[in-house]
Swiss-Prot record:
Region: Disordered, residue numbers: 203-223
Gene Ontology CC annotation, any one: cytosolic large ribosomal subunit
Gene name, Swiss-Prot/TrEMBL: rpl2
Domain of life: Archaea
Keyword Methyltransferase attributed: no
PANTHER family (alphabetical): LARGE RIBOSOMAL SUBUNIT PROTEIN UL2, RIBOSOMAL PROTEIN L2
Protein's UniProt name: Large ribosomal subunit protein uL2
Swiss-Prot/TrEMBL keywords: Ribonucleoprotein, Ribosomal protein, RNA-binding, rRNA-binding
Family: Belongs to the universal ribosomal protein uL2 family.
Subunit structure: Part of the 50S ribosomal subunit. Forms a bridge to the 30S subunit in the 70S ribosome.
Function as written in the Swiss-Prot or TrEMBL entry: One of the primary rRNA binding proteins. Required for association of the 30S and 50S subunits to form the 70S ribosome, for tRNA binding and peptide bond formation. It has been suggested to have peptidyltransferase activity; this is somewhat controversial. Makes several contacts with the 16S rRNA in the 70S ribosome.
SUPFAM superfamilies documented for this protein: Nucleic acid-binding proteins, Translation proteins SH3-like domain
GO biological process terms held by the UniProt record: cytoplasmic translation
GO MF annotation list: rRNA binding; structural constituent of ribosome
Species: Methanosarcina barkeri (strain Fusaro / DSM 804)
Length: 238
């Protein structure tokens, strides 16, 4: 009798397949500020968060509030950050996108006003303000997609810090192993044809081949539902 394949085991929700969120430092959210006002804060430390690839900044605001924010390029310990409608449009400040000039780079963008920031949060990425209309602002996302947002949505001016991360090779499998331990993923990932017959429908045999058709019905049972699921066609397009 075969064993449960990885896709079945993942559904059980054991710690192997769950993100270690107890190690994550905080949910990074823009501070709430009254309209037509702004507050200033000072960066007292730059830290690493296992939850993300970009560094985070510990900021103490003039109200006494201490908050962790996503760090942008150019931010250092001792830098001053402004947040609010009256804040200057300069790197690191949190301002409404409706007040950002066209062509400026922004990151950590809100989807709705005061939701804290949803888009463009990975290291080294940025979006570009394209144009403004009376009640909406067009922003070019890193994917190239144009997204229309409420001009009251806030964003950080500049580029997320930590750029160039994807250009650096891992060099050692141990480095990749420790990185994957912070994610909800199983590493290393073994192909089905390299497994034993009890572990996967494509396992076993004298050499690495599935040994059976790789197309499978949409209604196949969970242990067999691997390969090209409900494929309309297979092979090279002619």
């Amino acid at each position: 009798m075969g064993k449960r394949i990885i896709s079945q085991n993942r559904g059980r929700g054991t710690p192997t397949y769950r993100a270690p969120s107890h190690k994550y430092k905080a949910e990074l959210r823009h501070p709430r500020v009254d309209e037509n006002t702004s507050i200033q804060g000072k960066v007292i430390n730059l830290e690493h968060d296992p939850a993300r690839s970009a560094p985070i900044a510990k900021v103490v605001f003039e109200t006494g509030e201490e908050r962790l924010l996503l760090a942008s390029e150019g931010i250092a310990v001792g830098s001053t950050i402004e947040c609010g409608d009256d804040a200057d449009v300069r790197p690191g400040n949190i301002v409404p996108i409706g007040k950002v000039p066209e062509g400026f780079f922004i990151c950590n963008i809100e989807s709705k006003p005061n939701d804290g920031g949803r888009f463009v949060r990975s290291s080294g990425v940025y979006a570009t303000v394209v144009t403004h209309e009376s009640n909406r602002t067009a922003v070019a996302m890193p994917s190239g997609n144009i997204k229309w947002l409420n001009p009251k949505c806030r964003a950080v001016v500049g580029i997320v810090a930590g750029g160039g991360r994807v250009d650096r090779p891992w060099l050692k499998a141990g480095k990749k192993y420790h990185k994957m331990k912070t994610r909800a993923a199983k590493y290393p990932r073994v192909s089905g044809v390299a497994m034993n017959p009890v572990d996967h429908p494509f396992g076993g045999g004298a050499w690495k081949h599935p040994g059976k058709p790789t197309t499978v019905s949409r209604n196949a049972p969970p242990g067999r539902k691997v390969g090209l699921i409900a494929a309309r066609r297979t092979g090279m397009k002619r």
